[in-house]
């Protein structure tokens, strides 16, 4: 669709693409909305969520594909099947190129439009968290210096988001909780800092529990779901750490 649509039309088309599960096109509609918004004003909550859902679905299927291909690659290497290993490596490389492209697309949008135009604290945390998330996705499959850089960029974005969240958002706010969830996963999976991951998840969970009675009805479901995920991770990570200590 080469024609330029109005902002409302882009929102409608993004919803249509979402219903049809055509997430690459959903991304395109939301990118056009953001790039074409003059002046580059702040997105509404609905627009922001549509953008997030679009990218989350595209990156989600690619991350799942990468994990499957990587696991097949390990199996083929253990079987010493050189021909298959070579084919799988090439295929993994193709998936990684797509992952890099999607990540750089949203990161470019965040740096050029979304973060600079964010005025509300909630928006700032949302976009800085998103920036951290997509640098983290790069760190998942990059190696060497590229992985180190992606991890450093993740840390900077998450820390900036955390500073605003702790200052301005309630401990029960779903965006603050989501940040704590993803930041702790980053510590656990990318930095291999199990203790820091656990302490961060535990603190976020306990601070939210202490203020649970202040939760508004509209965000109750979102907040309690993320709290459940924080608790699930804590349980899993604690038992993993216990197993490692037992083995040692």
From Swiss-Prot:
Is associated with a DNA binding complex that binds to the G box, a well-characterized cis-acting DNA regulatory element found in plant genes. Involved in the regulation of nutrient metabolism. Negative regulator of freezing tolerance that modulates cold-responsive C-repeat-binding factors (CBF) DREB1A AND DREB1B proteins stability by facilitating their ubiquitin-mediated degradation; this processus is counteracted by B1L. Belongs to the 14-3-3 family. Gene3D superfamilies: 14-3-3 domain. Disruption phenotype: Disturbed levels of several metabolites (e.g. beta-alanine, ribose, aspartate, pyroglutamate, glutamate, asparagine, fructose-6-phosphate, myo-inositol, 1,4-diaminobutane, palmitate and shikimate). Enhanced freezing tolerance associated with enhanced cold induction of cold-responsive C-repeat-binding factor (CBF) target genes in the double mutant lacking both GRF6 and GRF8, probably due to the suppression of ubiquitin-mediated degradation DREB1A and DREB1B degradation by the 26S proteasome pathway. Enhanced freezing tolerance in the triple mutant lacking B1L, GRF6 and GRF8. PANTHER family: 14-3-3 PROTEIN. Its main location: nucleus. This is 14-3-3-like protein G-BOX factor 14 kappa. One of its GO terms (biological process) is regulation of metabolic process. It comes from Arabidopsis thaliana. It is found in: Nucleus; Cytoplasm. Disulfide bonds: none annotated.
């Amino acid at each position: 669709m080469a024609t330029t649509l109005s902002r409302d039309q882009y929102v409608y088309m993004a919803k249509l693409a979402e219903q049809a599960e055509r997430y690459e096109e959903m991304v395109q509609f939301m990118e056009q909305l953001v790039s074409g918004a003059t002046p580059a004003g702040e997105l509404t909550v609905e627009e922001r969520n549509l953008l997030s859902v679009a990218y989350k679905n595209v990156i989600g299927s690619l991350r799942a594909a990468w994990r499957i291909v990587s696991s097949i690659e390990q199996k083929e290497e253990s079987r010493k099947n050189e021909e298959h290993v070579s084919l799988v490596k090439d295929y993994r490389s193709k998936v990684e190129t797509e992952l890099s492209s999607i990540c750089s697309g949203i990161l470019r949008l965040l740096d050029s439009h979304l973060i600079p135009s964010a005025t509300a604290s909630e928006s700032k945390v949302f976009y800085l968290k998103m920036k951290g998330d997509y640098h983290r996705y790069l760190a998942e499959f990059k190696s060497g210096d590229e992985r180190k850089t992606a991890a450093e960029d993740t840390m900077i974005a998450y820390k900036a988001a955390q500073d605003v969240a702790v200052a301005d958002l309630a401990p029960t706010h779903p965006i603050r909780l989501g940040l704590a969830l993803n930041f702790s996963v980053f510590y656990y999976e990318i930095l291999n800092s199990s203790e820091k991951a656990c302490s961060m998840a535990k603190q976020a969970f306990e601070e939210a529990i202490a203020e649970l009675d202040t939760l508004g009805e509209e965000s109750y479901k979102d907040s309690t779901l993320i709290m459940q995920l924080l608790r699930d991770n804590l349980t899993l990570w604690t038992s993993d750490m216990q197993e490692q200590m037992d083995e040692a």
